[in-house]
């Protein structure tokens, strides 16, 4: 765990960045950058001991930020719902601008995505596998571009960098498993790819906080590129069945080629450079349900 460092966290109100910023704030000077558009955003950061800074990364202007951060976790994104050129500028060009602005840092983490990978069927995807064109093409190719931009800047200016390809996060603040839980509770079908089982390696909040901080600590030049996921593989079919047992609801699956292809990451490199995750997926899913639906009595509590 970092101590007595000056840390910049972008996208600081998000479900990934906020828990990391909160964990670091007790022993570090943490600055949280976000657009702060929702009521209570600033107070949420302040209550966690985080210095809240209103800044929109899409502007590409970082002159208002200090340039002496010792560590940076860059999680702010354009999700790619609008103009593709804006998405590339925010996620690639402006990420490079921020990396250069923070070039004095001892470690910088660029948050990429596992969705850049082309689907390879029933096998785990390693960092060496090539990109494809998934359903959210704008977001994915902008992140591939961001990896290239940040790699060039890091190597040219010798800035220690880790690129994490985020695969499947979940916890009290949400994530794809939480979204599927809501669909189950409403009786809605869950769309899945027909090439079953739909394997993932979901990573719970406690673990992604630990491995996110570790990613800053091990940054180097040339950059490290690593899949960021849980150590255990579990299919959507299996984890939805488990959630269904806990809440007393039978999941309904709808298999269609129009659904997202499964994202099953190879975590060999992650285990080597970041370590193993600690929370078993069943324990993590139970915690998520208890946090998001305290009104529910889970199966073994009835």
Where are these regions (language model features)?
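Glycine-rich Rossmann NAD(P)(H)-binding loop
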Residues: 169-171, 192-199, 224-234, 257-260, ...
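Conserved C-terminal active-site "lid" loop/helix of NAD(P)H-dependent oxidoreductases
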Residues: 205, 235-241, 255-287, 294-301
């Amino acid at each position: 765990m970092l101590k007595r460092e000056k840390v910049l966290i972008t996208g600081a109100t998000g479900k990934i960045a906020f828990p990391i910023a909160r964990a670091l704030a007790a022993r570090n000077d943490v600055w949280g950058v976000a657009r702060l558009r929702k009521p209570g955003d600033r107070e949420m950061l302040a209550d966690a001991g985080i210095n809240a800074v209103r800044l929109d990364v899409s502007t590409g202007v970082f002159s208002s930020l200090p340039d002496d951060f010792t560590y940076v976790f860059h999680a702010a994104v354009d999700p790619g719902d609008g103009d593709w050129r804006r998405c590339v500028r925010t996620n690639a060009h402006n990420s490079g601008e921020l990396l250069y602005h923070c070039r004095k840092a001892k470690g910088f983490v660029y948050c990429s995505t596992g969705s850049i990978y082309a689907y390879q069927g029933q096998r785990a995807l390693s960092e060496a596998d090539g990109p494809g064109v998934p359903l959210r093409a704008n977001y994915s190719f902008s992140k591939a571009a961001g990896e290239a931009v940040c790699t060039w800047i890091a190597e040219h200016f010798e800035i220690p960098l880790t690129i994490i390809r985020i695969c499947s996060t979940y916890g009290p603040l949400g994530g794809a498993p939480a979204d599927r839980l809501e669909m189950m509770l409403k009786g809605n079908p869950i769309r899945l790819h027909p090439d079953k089982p739909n394997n993932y390696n979901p990573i719970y909040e406690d673990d992604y906080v630990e491995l996110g901080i570790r990613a800053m600590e091990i940054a180097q030049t040339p950059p490290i590129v690593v899949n960021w996921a849980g150590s255990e593989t579990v299919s959507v079919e299996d984890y939805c069945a488990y959630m269904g047992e806990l809440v007393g609801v039978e999941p309904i699956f709808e298999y269609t080629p129009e659904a997202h292809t499964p994202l099953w990451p190879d975590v060999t490199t992650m285990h080597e450079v970041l370590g193993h995750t600690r929370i078993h997926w069943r324990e993590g899913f139970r915690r998520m349900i208890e946090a998001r639906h305290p009104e529910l009595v889970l199966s073994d509590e009835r």
